[in-house]
């Protein structure tokens, strides 16, 4: 019987002390199931430390390890897209480079996909062992994804997931320079499930995911997958117009009933500031969409590969 292959994609950034441990844990985990072959695609996301040399040593020691070295830091999701382009497995898994993803539970994560019950399985952590800022960012992304993508409220995204080959094939068709991989997986199939598990404490290095990055990721989600913010702008504009109309009628009636009362300067300024602020916010939303359309038209790349190791055919320098 021909072995099925699992491709593991690891975005790497500032992880010279942990990524080799993650790779070894993958080897040990797959060794438990000899009916599966595997490959490991590690993507150096322009890391400032010595992680590339660590990965090159892994390539020299193990032909199943592939490495992409990106010329510019584009973030985790761009690194994942680069890695997905060179995977050859029947199943594609993604995990972090910091030893926090519980690889000892990988076969539990794999089970619903392996048995045909789902096309994508994502780890759902009971309580994430992260900083309050990162947890807040995760919560913001979860709420935003539920509203923008139509994601069920009880479905949670995380960095530890596995998907079928056809889902990966659909994901890499996306050419926008601002990918949101979790949304792309959910867009490719509605058969997405969570597998409950507990993540590990961080024992090596420190996290680099900030609230700002979470908000940036949410912006990628709503400008790439939904026009709801534009519709919201219409609703807010109509509401402001209605409030202004009612206020205008009230002002006229009040003036007729109380002709000696001077018009209130402070209330007028408050209304002007409110409406001016709303107009700027709505123009900002529209501008964000237009700006990304402009960038897309100019063929801005998702990622740029400086060099690759043990990869038969590296992805195009610019994904177009």
Enumerate the predicted regions with their spans:
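Structured catalytic core of nucleotide-sugar glycosyltransferases
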Residues: 1-131, 144, 319
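Hydrophobic helical membrane-anchoring modules
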Residues: 2, 180-320
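Short conserved micro-motifs on helix faces and helix-strand junctions that flank
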Residues: 11, 70-72, 116, 161, ...
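Residues in soluble alpha-helical coiled-coils and helical-bundle/repeat scaffolds
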Residues: 14-17, 100, 104, 172, ...
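Solvent-exposed polar/charged
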Residues: 60, 85, 111, 138, ...
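Acceptor/aglycone-binding surface of glycosyltransferases and processive sugar-polymer synthases
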Residues: 70-72, 76-86, 91, 103-179, ...
